[in-house]
Amino acid sequence: MEISINKEKALVVFSGGQDSTTCLFWAKKRYKEVVAVSFDYNQKHKLELECAKDICKKHGVEHHILDMKLLNQLAPNSLTRADMKVDEDAPKDGPPNTFVDGRNLLFLSFAAVFAKQRGINNIITGVSQSDFSGYPDCRDVFIKSLNVTLNLAMDYQFVLITPLMWIDKAETWKLADDLGVLDIVKNETLTCYNGIKGNGCGECPACKLRKNGYVEFKRLYK
């Protein structure tokens, strides 16, 4: 039996941060119809959902927010608990306390259920192995494994697409520049674990990675 894949539609897993926003505009260049889905897991940096909503509204992207607050009950971490301070540096052993067990597994699984109902095969996510910050669920091997599992679980042909998988933050900034959305990514996104839009707090690991990448981008490409 021939498998039919709709190449005109794509679903973007969209947090409102640098990486997923870059992926959103990457998708808009390649697909006729782009839908974005975000997840509310009671994150402290909840302003990211407002950023996601605003970006989608401004640029004509259909946007949905799914309730995933159950994840906060299952996996205590510094992104959801006010009494836990965000690790400023990666620990020597194990992932940092900003890692949310099962987050990408659950997000991509729920995104796949949503996509199937809409007749969408292509699911785009901004994970990167080059800058994976010690998060095991950002690795290429995980994405490939999950892609197979989702296809088997739902008897459907999903294609998990990772435009940033093998590029670093400097190259991600360059991609945003090439797409003509550098200012949008720089000013309208939220990457900061402490919930500060744009350049962020400058102290958390996400802000350091973002800033260092931007400095390197300016040095190499501008």
Curated annotation (Swiss-Prot):
GO terms for molecular function: ATP binding; ligase activity, forming carbon-nitrogen bonds; zinc ion binding. The keyword Calcium does not apply. InterPro entries: QueC (IPR018317), Rossmann-like_a/b/a_fold (IPR014729). It catalyses: 7-carboxy-7-deazaguanine + NH4(+) + ATP = 7-cyano-7-deazaguanine + ADP + phosphate + H2O + H(+). Gene3D superfamilies: HUPs (3.40.50.620). The keyword Zinc applies. Its EC number is 6.3.4.20. CDD domains: QueC-like. PANTHER family: 7-CYANO-7-DEAZAGUANINE SYNTHASE. Homodimer. This is 7-cyano-7-deazaguanine synthase. It comes from Clostridium acetobutylicum (strain ATCC 824 / DSM 792 / JCM 1419 / IAM 19013 / LMG 5710 / NBRC 13948 / NRRL B-527 / VKM B-1787 / 2291 / W). The gene is queC.
